[in-house]
Amino acid sequence: MTDKLIGFYDPVRMKAERKTSETEIKLEMNLRGTGQYQFDTEIPFFEHMLSHISKHGLIDLNLWLRGDIEIDCHHSVEDTAILMGTTIHKQLGDKAGIFRYGHFTLTMDEVLTTVAVDLGGRYFFKYTGPELTGKFGIYDAELSLEFLQKLALNAKMNLHVVVHYGDNKHHVHESIFKALGKALRMAIAQDSAAAGAIPSTKGVLE
């Protein structure tokens, strides 16, 4: 397995690659973008969900992915989350001047979902809501929780997802990924009042 981060910390754009016996991924991400995205993953529903993070988080995302989808999509989704999370963490650098925290409550027809994040350098993930089961094309619905957990772990962030109510599984998924984009946008944004300070009384964030 090889992970390669190109440009280690680049406030404009970061490129990263990951290659294992199960997947090969090329990623380009700009956390302070305009919500532009381009995907080539062979997993249409996954692309649909990632587009919501990009559009609502104003994160430019260019992703090329090839994985062992003849088995299932697990490795492809998991490894993408690992690479995206690692890239988020590295691109934020010392996190000076960012808000650090973000949360958003989003409605998607009959569904109401809240997502809250803390980019403070510590991992925690909690999902509360209906069981995610079934399939969207070749994508197993339960993989969304795998994606979120691995994203939080590798971005070193707290991520709480609460689906308050609603049972249309497509709407539930859309609400989660859209709210995640919105919450990340808030947390990543520069706090002008902070004057570039580290958002922690410790004076440092990992």
Curated annotation (Swiss-Prot):
CDD domains documented for this protein: IGPD
Keywords: Amino-acid biosynthesis, Cytoplasm, Histidine biosynthesis, Lyase
EC primary class: lyase
Keyword Lyase appears in the UniProt entry: yes
Reactions this protein catalyses: D-erythro-1-(imidazol-4-yl)glycerol 3-phosphate = 3-(imidazol-4-yl)-2-oxopropyl phosphate + H2O
InterPro entries named in the record: IGPD_sf (IPR038494), ImidazoleglycerolP_deHydtase (IPR000807), ImidazoleglycerP_deHydtase_CS (IPR020565), Ribosomal_Su5_D2-typ_SF (IPR020568)
GO biological-process terms attached to the record: L-histidine biosynthetic process
GO MF terms, alphabetically ordered: imidazoleglycerol-phosphate dehydratase activity
Pathway where it operates: Amino-acid biosynthesis; L-histidine biosynthesis; L-histidine from 5-phospho-alpha-D-ribose 1-diphosphate: step 6/9
Subcellular location, record wording: Cytoplasm
Enzyme Commission number, as recorded: 4.2.1.19
PANTHER family (UniProt xref): IMIDAZOLEGLYCEROL-PHOSPHATE DEHYDRATASE, IMIDAZOLEGLYCEROL-PHOSPHATE DEHYDRATASE HIS7
Family affiliation: Belongs to the imidazoleglycerol-phosphate dehydratase family.
Name of the molecule in the record: Imidazoleglycerol-phosphate dehydratase
Species whose genome carries this gene: Leptospira interrogans serogroup Icterohaemorrhagiae serovar Lai (strain 56601)
